[in-house]
Amino acid sequence: MFMTRSEYDRGVNTFSPEGRLFQVEYAIEAIKLGSTAIGVKTKDAVVLGVEKRLTSPLMESHSVEKLFEIDSHIGCAISGLTADARTIIEHARVQTQNHRFTYDEPQGIESTTQSICDLALRFGEGEDGEERIMSRPFGVALLIAGIDEHGPQLYHSEPSGTYFRYEAKAIGSGSEPAKSELVKEFHKDMTLEEAEVLILKVLRQVMEEKLDSKNVQLAKVTAEGGFHIYNDEEMADAVAREQQRMD
């Protein structure tokens, strides 16, 4: 007896006759409703930038978290469901600390990304005794930035458990126009400051609200300073530099 489309929708571990997992596809679509996040890799660093949607004038901007530290040399930007992201990030933090404790070295960026994607597949109904983290796919995508022995690296992970390495990448609601601008403006010899300006320029173009230092946030990963989320003063300076380029 054949299953209907709605039954394939409900079965998170069941492929349709066309070879599709609808719940995973829906999770990917949910990310397209999320706030825009952008990552740019330079020769010496990786810069992340995110849109912070303030749904009320009474909301404190510091409470809207879209950038997270995983380890001293790794951080990420998220788009999608923040609650899902916290589960993934907590898992990644434990994995990186276990690796550091066991091997007395920082975990590689790709290994960290792999552990995140392994977790992304642990949804639905498992076998007896098999732990499942979620009853559905995670509704969040990550831009994972870090520096290891291979230099600066930028990865994108999605709910399907797929990940790819990028030189520049945008996710979220403004990802399509942002990607077009990144393709046009990105070059491999960019400095860190140029990457900051490019990210803010692209965010300014795709955001519905006027960009200022309160509704965007930047972070960077460098060999000297590790992962660092910009404070209010640094954000104001970065936005001012981008504004000067426009003028």
From Swiss-Prot:
Keyword Nucleus: yes
GO biological process per UniProt: proteasome-mediated ubiquitin-dependent protein catabolic process
Compartments (UniProt record): Cytoplasm; Nucleus
Alphabetized UniProt keyword annotations: Cytoplasm, Nucleus, Phosphoprotein, Proteasome
Modified residues annotated as Phosphothreonine in this record: 55
Coiled coil feature spans: none
CDD domains reported in the protein's UniProt record: proteasome_alpha_type_5
Entry's transmembrane regions: none
PROSITE patterns, alphabetized: PROTEASOME_ALPHA_1, PROTEASOME_ALPHA_2
GO-annotated cellular components: cytosol; nucleus; proteasome core complex, alpha-subunit complex
Listed Gene3D superfamilies: Glutamine Phosphoribosylpyrophosphate, subunit 1, domain 1
Pfam families reported for this sequence: Proteasome, Proteasome_A_N
NCBIfam families the UniProt entry points to: PRK03996.1
Role description: The proteasome is a multicatalytic proteinase complex which is characterized by its ability to cleave peptides with Arg, Phe, Tyr, Leu, and Glu adjacent to the leaving group at neutral or slightly basic pH. The proteasome has an ATP-dependent proteolytic activity.
Assembly and interaction partners: The 26S proteasome consists of a 20S proteasome core and two 19S regulatory subunits. The 20S proteasome core is composed of 28 subunits that are arranged in four stacked rings, resulting in a barrel-shaped structure. The two end rings are each formed by seven alpha subunits, and the two central rings are each formed by seven beta subunits. The catalytic chamber with the active sites is on the inside of the barrel.
Family, as annotated: Belongs to the peptidase T1A family.
Name under which the protein is recorded: Probable proteasome subunit alpha type-5
Name of the gene this protein is made from: pup2
